Amino acid sequence: RYWRFLKLHHFGPRSVVCTGFVFLGKGVELSARRGYGRIIIESWVHIGDACHIRAHEGSILIGTKTVMGRDNTINAYLDISIGAQCIISDSIYMCDFDHRFSDPLIPIRSQGIVKSPVRVGADVWLGTKVSVLRGSQIGQGSVIGANSVVRGLIEPMSVAAGVPAKMIKSRLTVDRKSMEVEAHGESVRRRTRHALNEISGNAASESTPDIN
């Protein structure tokens, strides 16, 4: 099911570095441009089939125990870091650059690019077909819904979705209604226990013979 090193391109000394055992699926591409790019994959990372991770320039870091699905693409020209123990679902695109297109008289491909780093915190879950664009910061413990486009800051412990992705709720917020239902249930349980104790006490008193 997994190969340790499949289609692993070393375009320069230590261009691709694995700090421990790494699981690579079929058709995985890891490429770093000689003298410009570097990929660092920490131990116990799982990368699924047909993923393409390319450091054209700059660096890509994938933290320990992160799991990636299949058909994902990461393109870096500056710096992309993914924290430890993240869940990266299928068909995700992540990049740290955009093409300039301000001059209509010059072909877009000739106008150069603009770059900003991407930061994905630890314990983040990216749903299927999420796009993470340049300059994005996704805080630790956040969940991004399927088909969302992330551009900018997502606070830690957020549940976010949409185009562009916006916070729907915080994982730290306890639903007030759930708290009220639980409090009511506990109150009912206390009253029930009290009533049963009274019934048991009365029954015991009635069954005790009068010795006077």
Task: Annotate each language-model stretch with its function.
Residues R1-R14, T19-G20, Q85, S91-I92, ...:
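Terminal amphipathic alpha-helical/low-complexity segments used for targeting or macromolecular assembly
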Residues L24-S136, V163, R171-L172:
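Flexible, glycine/small-residue-enriched loop-and-beta-strand segment within the central core
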